[in-house]
Amino acid sequence: MRYKYCPECGIKLTDRQAGDDGLVPYCNECQMYWFNTFASCVIVMVVNEFQEIAMLHQSYISDEFETFVAGFMTPGETAEQAAVREVKEELGLEVEHLEYAGTHWFAKREQLMHAFIGYVKKRDFVLSTEVNDANWVTFEEAPKRMFPDRPGNTQHILYRQYTAHINGK
């Protein structure tokens, strides 16, 4: 989010030098800098003991491609807590082991994605109202259902990391 008006008093902000950060929106009334902000999100590739991957169809995201579990972090929540919560909310599954897979910038939506591989026991899904459908798919089938592999697509980054892991690299 790029601030144009002060969220506290509503006055139009002016650019002011803020040390090494350069010009930053500033409120002369409140005497506060308002640095640009962005959302922190999680994305989780959910994998079961048979190396099947949970693929979600969410029509508000795409009618053509499927995705992994993802969602916004809430204030006071760690990325790990958000990842476990999102898997429970969207699929009704308990994460047994969570493996951190780095952070990735999603420029299109100005979001910082905290990526994880979440290991679960294979169970039937209990879907959230946000999810139209979900399926366990084979490791080999998953990339065919994903969004195209382009810069910023965390799905493929996670998939490649998991591929390296199971191939012992």
Mark where each language-model region is:
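Conserved Nudix-box catalytic region and its N-terminal flanking loop in Nudix hydrolases
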Residues: 47-89
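A generic fold-level signal
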Residues: 1, 39, 48, 108-111, ...
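Unchanged
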Residues: 73-97, 102-154
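Short connector loops at helix/strand junctions that flank enzyme active sites
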Residues: 22, 37-41, 63, 68, ...
